Structure formats: structure tokens, C-alpha cells
């Protein structure tokens, strides 16, 4: 049985009485569980046999994610919590270009064929913003859509499908995000357009979740180092700066947000960074769209990378450093992380999402999530200003 926290119960109650709306909840607030609980109610509602109906009314639910990795993670979570309940019989389809153990396609005709042949079952479709238009093109009936990390939906290529489904009276649409995206230009999509996005049916503050013990407060740490001109810091010096900063943080599980993919590769290939990590008892790993997953110098599949990352995160005594550029910042659940090191500046959304990776309550010994910026050039100075502003917003 799914047990909801008080703020989650408020969200689910609001979803049951509003056919459209925005749910603003900080990272770590358990929004996926709210989707699952609502889906359970929707699927159960179709089991009520009408007087003249020979079959129950089956439902189709779509879950939209910004990345394939998050779509796969959502799929696993839904399957785990919905389980094998015979009253929740369902078929699962993935509509994206990634690998999955479930049926998968991005062909509109194939989507319609799958939908029609499974008319006796409830249906769950996991897709990305890149591929949502394929479901639209299929012409299938959709009952409910959960737009996760909904700030992505305002992007020019993603907005038409969002606008289409939001404009249908018989489709429930919910937009989940910690960081709603607003645009000042009337010509650009914006989440303050209530005709498309609805009202904010629930807005949960980070301070409420911190006070309730559901997430941890972030702790800002600025590591001041020898200053150099931007672009003039040799990679061996960046390696030393990073190692000094990791030592300063004094924790076991560290996420490094690199400036460029090339910076990660150069640190690994051209310096003693990894060997010095090993001498400190740290394993190391990184993943990029160009190199794939690397664990302690060995190439691994994406599945093995994330399985290892999850396992290490749950192992209290394990020490590791994971480097990335952007692939781990949004939505991806990485348990156990204790500190995030910002090597580069980001927008407000990306900073908030990254901080969200380290303020989850993963173990009893963790009292806060460390948010650290090593400062050795002008990039570091500007990064401190933006990251500090986000931390202050979370704590206010």
C-alpha cells in the first residue's frame, strides 16, 4: 500500500478535483509517488462496471520526461509500486529511442496498433518531450498526462504537443516542476499561461519539507584558491584545485559538475587526478553523451553505469566521485550523494536541480547537503553569486 506524506496527500487530493494544473514541489518532494497514487486511482475508477457495460472502462496514462534515462526510471518506479495487483492490469509502452525491456516504438502507426490491440487493459506510456508528438500523431485517446520537469515543455520544439493535449477537454494534464519557467515575451510559451498550464493547484515550499525532515538544508561552501585568468588554468592545476576542494568537503560521495566534456576527459587522461582519488579511497566514474559510461577507467554500458551508481550510493561505506556535464542534473535519482561541486555557471533551473541531488535524506548520518564552488577564476566568482542566490531562496 502506498503511504503518502502530508504534502503528497494534498497534491493527490488536488489532482482528484482539478482536471488540469501545476504542481510546484521541490526536488526530493516525492512527486513521482503522487503520479503513481493518482494513476492507481484512475485505473481503479475504470473497474466500476456499468449496468449495461460488458467490459470495464480501461484508461491510458502518459508520463512525459525530459530524458530517456528519467523515462526509464519512472517506468521502474510505476512498476514497483503498482505491482501485480490484478485490479490494475496494464500494458506498458515506451515511446522514445532508448533501450528498454518493454515494448518500444516511435512510429505513430505502431503506437496506435499497440493501443488498439490492448483495449482490454489499462495502458501506461512512458515518453520524452522529444517524442510526445509521436503519440499525438497516432491519434490514440489519452485520459491523463503527467508532465514531469514541466519547465521543459515551454521549449519551442516541445510546446506544440503540450498545447495540443492541454486544449483537449477530456484529457487530464498535470505539470510537475520545482522550477516553473516564465517568459516575459508574449510570443514565447510561459507557465503563467493558465489557459495551457492551469493554475498552481499545489505549491510546496522547500522550507516545509526541510522542517518536516523530508529533505535536508543545503550548506554553502566556497573554496577560495589561487586565482588565474579564465582559460589559462592548466589542467593539472584544475586537478589540484578539485582535489583540494574534495578534501575540504570531507564527505564520501561527491558529484562534480564540469564546465565541458573535454574538461572531464582531460582530467582523466592527462593528470594524476584519478590516481590521487584512488589513494584517498575514492572510486571514480563519469558519463557523457560522447564517451558513454566509464567506471574506474573501464567502459561500461549505460545500464551498468547507473546500476553501479545506485548501488554505491546506497552503500554507506563506499567512497566515490562522479563527474558529469549535465546528464545527471535533471530528475535522475542518484541516492546517497553528499556534495555537489560546481565547476561552471548554470541557469537557475539547472542549479536548483543539481542542489536537489544532494539534499535528499538518504541516510541517518547526513545532516545537510554540501553545495561547493571552487573559486580560481572569474567563472568561479560568477558561479558563487548564482548558486548562493538559489541556496538562499531554498532556505527562505
Regions found by a protein language model. Give the residues of each.
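Walker A/P-loop
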Residues: 18-42
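Inter-Walker segment of RecA-like/P-loop motor cores
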Residues: 85-136
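Post-DEXD/H (motif II) to motif III coupling segment of the RecA-like Helicase ATP-binding lobe
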Residues: 151-215
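Conserved RecA-like P-loop NTPase helicase motor core
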Residues: 151-152, 289-396
